Amino acid sequence: MTEHLPASQVSFDENALIAERRAKLLALRAQGVAYPNDVKREHYAADVQAAFANVETWTAETLEASSHRVRMAGRLMAKRLMGKASFAQIQDESGRIQLLIQSNVLGEDSYAAFKVLDVGDIIAVEGGLTRTRTGELSVKVNVLRLLTKALRPLPDKWHGLTDVEQRYRQRYVDLIVTPESREIFIKRSKIIRALRTWLDARLFLEVETPMMHYIPGGAAAKPFVTYHNALDLELYLRVAPELYLKRLVVGGLERVYEINRNFRNEGVSTRHNPEFTMLELYEAYSTYHEVMDLAETMIRDTAQSVLGTTQVIWDGAQIDLGPIFRRWRMDEAVCHHNPEMSVAECTDRDALLLHCERLKIKVKSSYGWGRLLLSIFEATVEHTLIQPTFITDHPVEISPLARESDIESGYTDRFELFINGKEIANGFSELNDPEEQAMRFQKQVEAKEGGDDEAMYYDADYIRALEYGMAPTGGLGIGVDRLVMLLTGSTSIRDVLLFPYMRPER
């Protein structure tokens, strides 16, 4: 049975270890070799392991008889002293490999120096290859140098990084000791690369738009406020790039996309971080139906490219991205999950208020029927959408930038994609009527004056751009962090952000 030390004892022991390591560093400084910077690495652990993986071909005898030598560097992750011969493991970005260190091969002085190394130190080694009695490929070290002295000990294999908050605060330690965490961020990079490759192949142009806005817009969200000293001007960190991207469509860039950070001054949860990554794209002469097709295919192809499968497990749910995604009108979905409601009632504010009261849903007196319908949807439907589902045809009231439906007044050509009860994407046929957009902006201004701090501002320059004429356009926004959560099976957005927002340590 492993005895776990109390936190105070662990802290005391850690301080003692740090003091011991500082003393070793002081001795190295006295020798003038504290932090050498003249090492050339030529080989990586995973490459060496793969090249000599065949145990029958590469026996200990054939390896030692060969002329193969490696020059490697990495972090010392384990050390086992055994008299005149010892074993160790180093870890580089590709993986780990075992070291066989013998005093008669390395030399007595170097062997003595190895014995006082600490786990966590970064070292360089050279040597031939061999295989142990258990069949493990090993570097038979004849040159060893300390490159970086680690002053703080890594979490031991018993305690580890059990404090989740510490994992987020000290991601540098988490990446060293948690292979699963490292793999998530490698996959994240591959997912973003796959999205770019998919869009580039379809002749979308990647662009960059401002991160600081004079007028925040493009989403119903509370912005962060900053200040430009030289211009004596209040600015806002962007909540979305939408209005700038659509200006580019006006300018004739008919297929554009941007993958970048957005900032929203809102709550923090397992699904929300104040800064997050979004993919937004716009395609001229496209409708929301075609954008749904695009989103579905892109997500499916990205999963297949990165994972080799379209089936994933997310928070205990088996998700299949292979079949055609369901498409379901918001009012029909609400009525399906609330049989006491009729589709006709979905546009009746008084009826919706009664249903909200019955369902104990808190609403504001300023809500119109659109917001009330959304409130019922969020309370009774959203969490049930496990398999990929497009919820379509949102009310105009909650969609100030979307084109109103030609078929049904009060609704828009808009969709949101839900998977396992979480919103992954949002898109619509863009509103390109400048006069209608101006009226919608004015209603947003009135809502803001009425206390809605997430309502949009009036953007006169965007209206001016629309007055030059924007082609019929479809737009899409995908929450990249949530997509990464889906494809890595992560249950918290903090698990897929290298440095998630945390309150400062006291």
Swiss-Prot record:
Binding site for Mg(2+) 2: E423
Primary gene name: lysS
Subcellular localization, as worded in the UniProt entry: Cytoplasm
Protein name in UniProt: Lysine--tRNA ligase
Cofactor: record remark: Binds 3 Mg(2+) ions per subunit.
First-listed, main subcellular location of the protein, grouped into a coarse class: cytoplasm
Stored NCBIfam families: lysS_bact, PRK00484.1
Gene Ontology cellular-component annotations: cytosol
HAMAP family in the cross-refs: Lys_tRNA_synth_class2
Residues annotated to bind Mg(2+) 1: E416, E423
GO biological process, one term: lysyl-tRNA aminoacylation
Cofactor entry: Mg(2+)
Subunit relationships: Homodimer.
Similarity comment text for this entry: Belongs to the class-II aminoacyl-tRNA synthetase family.
Catalytic activity: tRNA(Lys) + L-lysine + ATP = L-lysyl-tRNA(Lys) + AMP + diphosphate
PANTHER family given in the database record: LYSINE--TRNA LIGASE, CHLOROPLASTIC_MITOCHONDRIAL, LYSYL-TRNA SYNTHETASE
Keyword annotations: Aminoacyl-tRNA synthetase, ATP-binding, Cytoplasm, Ligase, Magnesium, Metal-binding, Nucleotide-binding, Protein biosynthesis
UniProt organism field: Xylella fastidiosa (strain Temecula1 / ATCC 700964)
Annotated EC: 6.1.1.6
RNA-binding found in the keyword field: no
Enzyme class: ligase
One function term, GO molecular function aspect: ATP binding
Pfam family for this entry, one: tRNA-synt_2
